[in-house]
Amino acid sequence: MIKYYNRKNKDYDIEKVAGEKYLNWTYSSPIGMNLLEVFIKKKIFSKIYGFYCDRRLSQKKINKFINDFQIDMSLSENQLSNFKCFNDFFTRKLKKEARPIKTDKNLLISPGDGKLLAYENLNLNSVTEVKGINYSFYELINNDSLAKEYNNGTCLVLRLCPTDYHRFHFIDNGICENTIKLNGFYYSVNPIALSKIPSVFCKNKREYSIFHSENFGDIIFMEVGATCVGSIIQTYKPNTKVLKGDEKGYFKFGGSTVILFFKKNTIKIDDDILSQSKLGYETSVIMGEPIGNKK
């Protein structure tokens, strides 16, 4: 059971997990864990499933997924009949009015839909994942000199579950450098898996870029792949000015994570998000939702 904080009603909700029985079996049983290490965590498994989700045969999954998880299709830019395969539906764009962007330059917004954790005073040797598991920031980005620039800064971890809108966006005007790709495995990023596999973010396939934002300094913008994520697709044009709310990219099918790192004394995260993070609870947010302010 995954409990998260709902900002709207100021109470806790239970997340309905796609493939929960499969996740529990894989990460809790000896046979499942063996299969995970031998096959599931490897690229070939996610590639095979991604191939299926790109084919017309997968179209039949769409209606069941919508009904099971109560997806609001009135927000979708395209009609259901336009989706030729499951990934067409999964990577759907939303109508602009579905995710309005606050233009106030001092307002920090969420880069996507998902469950958010926030950590201040970043310790480079011990960044906390869900369930209190720690990992090294140095290991995560594999660049010691860059990592040191973010000592005592702020870290945001946005977990996108399969039922979420799966495009991610820029949080400010600015210029984003080229993407750096780091190879890795494809473990699940669901809290069920994070509690069983230490330092998942450091082990999984991931990409990051430096975003030179106009109002929040230089931000490390990282995307982490997961089980069944066929691809991390970057749609932005490097070294070209982007606007707050512009699309940066999207994930194909699977749960995924976006991680942002800010330098010291650049932002102040909203108190409710910080307090829930300290208690170990993620906070549900949507793309464009205010989550903090410029210091």
UniProtKB/Swiss-Prot annotation:
Its EC number is 4.1.1.65. Binds 1 pyruvoyl group covalently per subunit. The active site is at residues 113, 169, 256. Keywords: Cell membrane, Decarboxylase, Lipid biosynthesis, Lipid metabolism, Lyase, Membrane, Phospholipid biosynthesis, Phospholipid metabolism, Pyruvate, Zymogen. Is synthesized initially as an inactive proenzyme. Formation of the active enzyme involves a self-maturation process in which the active site pyruvoyl group is generated from an internal serine residue via an autocatalytic post-translational modification. Two non-identical subunits are generated from the proenzyme in this reaction, and the pyruvate is formed at the N-terminus of the alpha chain, which is derived from the carboxyl end of the proenzyme. The keyword Membrane applies. GO terms for molecular function: phosphatidylserine decarboxylase activity. One of its GO terms (biological process) is phosphatidylethanolamine biosynthetic process. It is a peripheral membrane protein. The modification Pyruvic acid (Ser) is found at residue 256. Pfam families: PS_Dcarbxylase. Its cofactor is pyruvate. It is an enzyme of class 4 (lyase). It comes from the Bacteria. Pathway: Phospholipid metabolism; phosphatidylethanolamine biosynthesis; phosphatidylethanolamine from CDP-diacylglycerol: step 2/2. It catalyses: a 1,2-diacyl-sn-glycero-3-phospho-L-serine + H(+) = a 1,2-diacyl-sn-glycero-3-phosphoethanolamine + CO2. Catalyzes the formation of phosphatidylethanolamine (PtdEtn) from phosphatidylserine (PtdSer). This is Phosphatidylserine decarboxylase proenzyme. It comes from Clostridium botulinum (strain Langeland / NCTC 10281 / Type F). The lineage of its organism: Bacteria, Bacillati, Bacillota, Clostridia, Eubacteriales.
